[in-house]
């Protein structure tokens, strides 16, 4: 790896998240915000995947027979729930320590997950494809957004679907997600995010379209400081999620 980047990975971002690897599964640790809004992310993705693939979410393992790739999986906070829902899950991350953390936790949980220290373009080069691809809270950390999104598109099979989430680049997100979360509330370590790398929904939609995908749904996430909970909203001015699909062959 060079001093700054390798493919879509940024060396500075890798160092930052590697240093926090052991905290992934601590609900009160560095990744507390992810634990807090994980149920909202899972519900959004589960419901849209079920509608797209024609699956019954009331079934014990509704996505049995389908494969899912989680890009930038970190410690596996999304991989494990989707494995329990029946997906054959592969999680990749450019930080080796994250993969170690995720693998140990999955083994302890008795879940048959596949984890690899790799970047999406590595899997593209191997000719891998998946029914579902996730890139949740990742695109704002990559070095080459265009290459990254192109890889996401290539990894999604015809007839497949992609779930994406990031932060909007607005003054509100600067105040809340950057200054508020990192410096005032100290939910995140200082320097976790670079506001300049946040993406507007129109920018992410355009990038996914160029990668051969069609955005079918968008939703925001909002935090209620009184209840301490997150919920889905139509307001996409800070955190937002997208659901995109690739046309069947």
Swiss-Prot record:
Catalysed reactions, as listed in the record: a 3-demethylubiquinol + S-adenosyl-L-methionine = a ubiquinol + S-adenosyl-L-homocysteine + H(+); a 3-(all-trans-polyprenyl)benzene-1,2-diol + S-adenosyl-L-methionine = a 2-methoxy-6-(all-trans-polyprenyl)phenol + S-adenosyl-L-homocysteine + H(+)
Pfam family, one: Methyltransf_23
Pathway in which this enzyme or protein is active: Cofactor biosynthesis; ubiquinone biosynthesis
Stored InterPro entries: SAM-dependent_MTases_sf (IPR029063), UbiG_MeTrfase (IPR010233)
GO biological process, one term: methylation
Binding site for S-adenosyl-L-methionine: 41, 72, 93, 136
Signal peptide bounds: none
EC number: 2.1.1.222, 2.1.1.64
GO MF assignments: 2-polyprenyl-6-hydroxyphenol methylase activity; 3-demethylubiquinol 3-O-methyltransferase activity; polyprenyldihydroxybenzoate methyltransferase activity
Keyword tags: Methyltransferase, S-adenosyl-L-methionine, Transferase, Ubiquinone biosynthesis
Top-rank lineage group of the source organism: Bacteria
Keyword Transferase in record: yes
NCBIfam families the UniProt entry points to: UbiG
HAMAP family, per the entry: UbiG
Function as written in the Swiss-Prot or TrEMBL entry: O-methyltransferase that catalyzes the 2 O-methylation steps in the ubiquinone biosynthetic pathway.
Family to which the UniProt record says this protein belongs: Belongs to the methyltransferase superfamily. UbiG/COQ3 family.
Protein name: Ubiquinone biosynthesis O-methyltransferase
Naturally occurring in which organism (per UniProt): Rhodospirillum rubrum (strain ATCC 11170 / ATH 1.1.1 / DSM 467 / LMG 4362 / NCIMB 8255 / S1)
Gene that encodes the chain: ubiG
């Amino acid at each position: 790896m060079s001093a700054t980047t390798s493919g879509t990975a940024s060396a500075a971002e890798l160092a930052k998240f590697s240093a926090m690897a052991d905290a992934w599964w601590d609900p009160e640790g560095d990744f507390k915000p992810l634990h807090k809004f994980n149920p909202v992310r899972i519900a959004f993705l589960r419901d849209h995947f079920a509608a797209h693939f024609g699956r019954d979410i009331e079934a014990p393992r509704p996505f049995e027979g389908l494969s899912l790739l989680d890009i930038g999986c970190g410690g596996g906070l999304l991989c494990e729930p989707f494995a329990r829902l029946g997906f054959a899950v592969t999680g990749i991350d450019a930080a080796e320590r994250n993969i170690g953390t995720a693998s140990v936790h999955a083994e302890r949980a008795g879940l048959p997950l596949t984890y690899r220290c790799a970047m999406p373009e590595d899997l593209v080069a191997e000719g891998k494809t998946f029914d579902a691809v996730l890139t949740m809270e990742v695109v704002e950390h990559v070095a080459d957004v265009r290459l990254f999104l192109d890889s996401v598109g290539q990894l999604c099979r015809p007839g497949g679907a992609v779930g994406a989430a990031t932060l909007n680049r607005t003054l509100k997100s600067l105040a809340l997600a950057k200054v508020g979360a990192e410096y005032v509330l100290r939910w995140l370590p200082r320097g976790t995010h670079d506001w300049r790398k946040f993406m507007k929904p129109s920018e992410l939609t355009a990038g996914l379209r160029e990668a051969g995908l069609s955005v079918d749904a968008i939703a925001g996430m909002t935090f209620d400081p009184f209840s301490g909970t997150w919920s889905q909203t139509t307001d996409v001015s800070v955190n937002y999620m997208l659901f995109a699909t690739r046309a069947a062959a």
